[in-house]
Each structure stands twice: as structure tokens, then as C-alpha cells.
Amino acid sequence: MSEEIFPLVNEQGDVVGKATRRECHSGSKLLHPVVHLHIFNTAGELYLQKRSMKKDIQPGKWDTAVGGHVDFGEDIPTALLRETREELGINAEGCELVQMYEFHSDREHELVYAYKIVYDKDITPSEETDGGRFWSMQEINDAIGQGILTP
């Protein structure tokens, strides 16, 4: 299997180059785009997935419902739909872009495209995760600072 290639972007999201996953996650701070999907049910609860213990970044922590990298040559909406199908087996058509922001960590620099959707059907997380469930806002507030959520 060949290594994944990600687009490198400027702060506006324009593609300015490309790099491997390893290069982007090595502390180089190369700005690359990612997609996140926040799934709410009609009760106002937020779905979080539990990251696999096999992940190299934030293993075993509760995270946004869908989060993934944009492949080189792929547009943002296509990446979001692909990641949502891969991780949860659902169709995210009709989701809404909420915000675009930069995320910095000691290992990487991401341009995050954050989307939301209201979804009340069954969700079957892939084996790429260690499960998932809907959380009330009180549960999320109680979990903040406990070391179980991703930043």
C-alpha cells in the first residue's frame, strides 16, 4: 500500500503543494485540510466516536463523529462524504458547513472544515473506531478536563 498524499493549502484553503501523511504529521507544521462532521440528534445530543487504540494520534479518546484527511486531488465535500461512509456507513448529504479554522498541535497544522447534520437513524461505526454513542451536553461538559476527549 502506498503512503497517503495530502494537499498542502494556504490559510484560505487554496492548494499550494502536496506532502505525504508522514511529512504532515512529523512536526513539520505543513498546513493540510481535514473534514469534521458533528452529528446531532433531534434531542440535541452530539454523537462522538471512540478513537481506536491503534491510532497514532489521540488513541482511545472520544472524538468528533467523523474526522479525516482530504486526499490530494479530492475536493472538500467529496472527502466529507467519503469519510462519513467509511467511518459510520451513513450518507451525510445535506450537511451544513459551520466553520473553517486552523488547528495547531505539536505534530501537525490542520485547516479544519467543520460541518454539522441532524441525524436520527441508526449509526454503525466501522471497525476503524472503538464504537460511538450520542452524548448529552451535560455529559460532554462533565467529561471536559478528564482526559477522555480529544482537544
Where do the language-model regions lie?
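Active-site acidic-Proline motif in GNAT/NAT acetyltransferases
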Residues: 68-74
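A glycine-rich, hydrophobic loop/mini-helix early in the fold
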Residues: 34-66
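Nudix hydrolase/Nudix homology domain
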Residues: 23, 60, 72, 99-151
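Acidic, metal-coordinating catalytic segment for phosphate/diphosphate chemistry
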Residues: 1-36, 40-42
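A sequence-level detector of short linear motifs
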Residues: 15-18, 48, 151
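Active-site segment of metal-dependent pyrophosphate-handling enzymes
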Residues: 43, 53, 77, 85-122
